[in-house]
Amino acid sequence: MIELDINASDKSLSHRAVIFSLLAQKPCFVRNFLMGEDCLSSLEIAQNLGAKVENTAKNSFKITPPTTIKEPNKILNCNNSGTSMRLYSGLLSAQKGLFVLSGDNSLNARPMKRIIEPLKAFGAKILGREDNHFAPLAIVGGPLKACDYESPIASAQVKSAFILSALQAQGISAYKESELSRNHTEIMLKSLGANIQNQDGVLKISPLEKPLESFDFTIANDPSSAFFLALACAITPKSRLLLKNVLLNPTRIEAFEVLKKMGAHIEYVIQSKDLEVIGDIYIEHAPLKAISIDQNIASLIDEIPALSIAMLFAKGKSMVRNAKDLRAKESDRIKAVVSNFKALGIECEEFEDGFYIEGLGDASQLKQHFSKIKPPIIKSFNDHRIAMSFAVLTLALPLEIDNLECANISFPTFQLWLNLFKKRSLNGN
């Protein structure tokens, strides 16, 4: 059996630890921070807003928040990070000053009206390009009044932006979403003294009566990153894998549950429940069967490209529906998945809200199919999750990815761990 502690810290928790520290009064400590490009954007923005960041150990920081958030003399660059842009928009909407948030071409083409509308409901002064649809965003922070908002989409980023504004508004605010999204923001903020109550699926958020408590967080491994190694095990005959120290929040392991329904043997071993549930995940290869996915999409939206690879190894038609938000990620992930599969000669079809794939079965059947075609260069579309998903497919097929380096956005050591898995699985370890 292969045992891996992938040291790929959770991206969601790393972002939030940095951003929430700005609402504290005393120094905060973040250990095992994800040194990926997205999270480093959040860290740099915190510094531009007046936070003092000191290295305390490898991938660990002491963050001393400013007495008051500083108005920056330059644009706050979120690079490719939608989490940075959306959560900072919520935080800064109530802070005195002018703040401009921008990103790379990919981020500036992603939908931002979904956060502008709820923030405007507080009375926030926020503008975006093309009638508030896109970044750059300009925010003139000021006093906010509590509001009630029902989000048409289930999005942890939208919810988090709302909560960060609500904590600084006058009065109790309410937020409802169509489906439960990641709940790290609620868990972390409540542990730091925020009054956030869930009443029959409606979040009631009271304004902060005092700064958030200082904290010392150690970030566990990211289940979204760990899933790529779980996928590698699921498609590699006779392989067994133990992934150590992984965040097991129920809103983050839905993709593992789908893989289990497809036939993979998966078990969880809980190690702690202090703040978030953390533990180990055991995966054992087994023949996969086709599946249709149309529920709990918000809890597995990031893993759907990787699940499409599992679907390729399952005989028969697999389908994904109700996942239109895949088109609003770093790339149009529906189009990216389908176009790459078509280039590989796989029967598939694109829908507005998903796709279907005609799976070929196990690795031997895939190799027989691909022996008849010239392998194309897989297009990553500069999207880390597309690149890593198809990189896992290279365990079974000799394929080239056009830009695997974009994995550095969320999983800088991805290639190292994938190569290690390949080496150990070949050796039978």
UniProtKB/Swiss-Prot annotation:
Report the GO molecular function annotations: 3-phosphoshikimate 1-carboxyvinyltransferase activity
Q: Where does 3-phosphoshikimate bind?
A: K11, S12, R16, S155, Q157, D302, K329
State where it is primarily located. cytoplasm
Where's the active site on this chain? D302 (proton acceptor)
Q: Where in the cell is it found?
A: Cytoplasm
| Top EC class of this enzyme | transferase
What chemistry does it catalyse, as a reaction equation?
A: 3-phosphoshikimate + phosphoenolpyruvate = 5-O-(1-carboxyvinyl)-3-phosphoshikimate + phosphate
Q: Which residues bind phosphoenolpyruvate?
A: K11, G82, R110, Q157, R333, R385
* Gene Ontology CC: cytoplasm
Q: Name one GO biological process term.
A: aromatic amino acid family biosynthetic process
Write down the EC number: 2.5.1.19
Its assembly, as annotated, is:
Monomer.
User: Which family would the database say this protein is a member of?
Assistant: Belongs to the EPSP synthase family.
- NCBIfam families xref list: aroA (TIGR01356)
- Outline what the protein does: Catalyzes the transfer of the enolpyruvyl moiety of phosphoenolpyruvate (PEP) to the 5-hydroxyl of shikimate-3-phosphate (S3P) to produce enolpyruvyl shikimate-3-phosphate and inorganic phosphate.
User: What is this protein's record name?
Assistant: 3-phosphoshikimate 1-carboxyvinyltransferase
